[in-house]
Amino acid sequence: PESKWPTAKLIEYKYDGARYQIHRDGDDVIIFNRKGVVVTQQFPDIVAKVTSYDISRFIIDTEVFPINGDGSPAKFSLMNSRFHSKDAQEGVRKCPVSLAIFDCLMYSGKGLLNTQLKDRMQFIEKFPDQAERVMNPDDTLSFYAKAISKGYEGIMIKDLNQVYKPKNRGWFKYKPPQINLDVVITGARYGDGKRSNVLASYDMAVSDSDGGFIDIGAIGTGFSDAQFLMLT
């Protein structure tokens, strides 16, 4: 409803990952999942990352998401390697991850739970590994297009005037509609870097009523290296 739409907005990428609250007090780090279960042992790489920060006492709200070798976002199903690996280092090898910090609940001993997001931002912005964001509503559509082109799920729209809520239902999510289409591959291009020897981008089209085709865009994500090689 329009009455619930925030007047002061912050727009961030929507990451296809898992939400974790990370507590650090000096060399001690604890990672909680959204059910409050301690999962620190699954993420030795994240522990190493946050203990490298100059800030030594904090509580942050984050999204941890799987990435491909080139740093692009991978399918969430890859996270099962983290959740179910008996050996943490094996999980790290099978499922490299990245961290996006989107909120701060405590900074150097200062509690921020009752502070509006627009005021928490001054603390959030002190951290590395922040979520990608814009605050100008005029940038929403271009930022959404950028998120999709980079392989992210879409965008989150948040109220800058809102205090912290653990199970926030006031955030708005915008993702591409999920529909099934019968498409035809009308062209293909070789990729860059490690994919320079395979066809890694495919032009897609749908048929029209005259028996021709209408281009609808290109796709280059969702395939494994073996699938790219097979299609080439």
Task: List the model feature ranges, each with a label.
Residues 1-35, 89-96, 120, 125, ...:
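Nucleic-acid 5′ end/cap handling module spanning
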